Amino acid sequence: QKDMLKLLFKAADLMNDIFWVENVEAKDAFMLGINNEKDRQYALINYGPWDEMNNLAPFIKGYGDKPAGAQFYPENMTVEEFDKFENPNKTSQYTLIRRNNKTRELEIVWYHEGFKEKTKAAAELLLEASKLAEDPGFATYLKLRAQALLIDDYFASDIAWLDMKNNLIDFVVGPIENYTDKLFGYKTAHEAYILIKDVEWSNKLTMYAKYLPQLQKELPVDAAYKMETPGSDVELNAYDVIFYAGDCNMAGKTIAINLPNDEQVQLEKGT
């Protein structure tokens, strides 16, 4: 399992690299322009020149306000231009909006194409790690997640992730949350967590998980707000996070997750 973890760390580092590009630009290119050591250290924490803990105030000379859409969209794109852009995949959480070099018109680029080198390398690492996984469910998840990174379809891997019951090591990886896209909230950013399950506390939480469907029914709100019934295969677990990468590591650390975000997965299986 130690050899497997080494591969997961490498895959997580690739999510770090991708998130830098999504948030500001490639890390090495960005850091070259910063000479002050304190600024360099704080930029590493914030994945860029904007203070995430202080209303995105720029702390490095030469930078203005952070683009609302980060680097998911062209900085000179207007909302009106986006609205007129006729492409069914423009609102996909797994596409970048770019400008065609020749026509200057908007076009979409799927994540697996825009970050081809990194996603392919991460997928290969996950496949290699799956061969070392002791838990069969975790091995299946890693294989499906590797495929998902290459095609931008995460449904099967999300289901496999929820099906895991006995794995002590967990790995959350890929484009997941949309908080960095403050323009429309469409685009999800890359991140990774490596976690070790706290078995004792997870067992204590099991009793609460089984009551969640009933608790939803008893919420003091109109029935109209309770029409969707989530899947009953819900889990509550406690983990020690041993590594954060990408979006979840920017400025503060994410300390709780409720995944997957896919509503269809939630209805079929839960979270």
Where are these regions (language model features)?
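Fold-level signature of zinc-dependent metallopeptidase catalytic domains
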Residues: 3-7, 85-271
